[in-house]
């Protein structure tokens, strides 16, 4: 049982690092929403479980997630948990290891008789040097509108 909302992010990372879709899905209410880093949206615990089972089998089976920073805002029986993460060990479609990723996971938790569970989650990648994306013929292009500083850095 999750006794404090702060523990939601810790339990998510633990389930992720164990590559355990059942433990991860159990952190959510039956009707929870989860939006992943590319905008795929699962609308219940079973969908969240299935998506993560697939991810652990095909993409993230060797991955390791680390919490870098966390902020919790309690709103009575509800809390918003924002957690910055880093991830290593992801595999390419060819099965080769790829570089480190970073992102932010936002969990909205609600306290119930069985402790805290997430009712909603949104996960997003952090893309260094990018402010937004611009839609073009080939899809979305990472874009930065800021003026380069001296030396070409933004």
PLM region descriptions:
Residues 1-30, 137-154:
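Short, low-complexity N-terminal intrinsically disordered segments enriched in polar/charged residues
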Residues 2-3, 21-75, 84:
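A solvent-exposed, acidic/Ser-Thr-rich amphipathic alpha-helical stretch
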Residues 72-80, 109-117:
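A short, structured loop/turn motif at beta-sheet edges
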Residues 77-89:
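A short hydrophobic beta-strand element
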Residues 88-99:
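Short, cysteine-centered beta-strand-loop-beta hairpins and adjacent loop/turn segments enriched
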Residues 111-112, 118-154:
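Low-complexity, intrinsically disordered terminal/linker segments enriched in charged
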């Amino acid at each position: 049982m999750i006794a404090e909302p702060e523990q939601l992010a810790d339990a998510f990372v633990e389930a992720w690092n164990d590559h355990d879709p059942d433990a991860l899905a159990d952190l959510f209410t039956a009707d929870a929403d989860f939006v992943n880093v590319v905008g795929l949206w699962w609308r219940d615990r079973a969908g969240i479980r299935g998506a993560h089972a697939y991810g652990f089998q095909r993409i993230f089976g060797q991955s390791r997630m680390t919490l870098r920073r966390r902020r919790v805002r309690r709103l009575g029986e509800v809390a918003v948990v924002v957690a910055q993460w880093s991830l290593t060990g992801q595999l390419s479609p060819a099965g080769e290891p790829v570089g480190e990723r970073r992102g932010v996971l936002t969990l909205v938790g609600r306290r119930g008789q069985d402790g805290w569970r997430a009712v909603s989650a949104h996960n997003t990648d952090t893309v260094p040097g990018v402010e937004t994306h611009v839609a073009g013929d080939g899809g979305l292009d990472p874009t930065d509108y800021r003026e380069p500083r001296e030396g070409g850095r933004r």
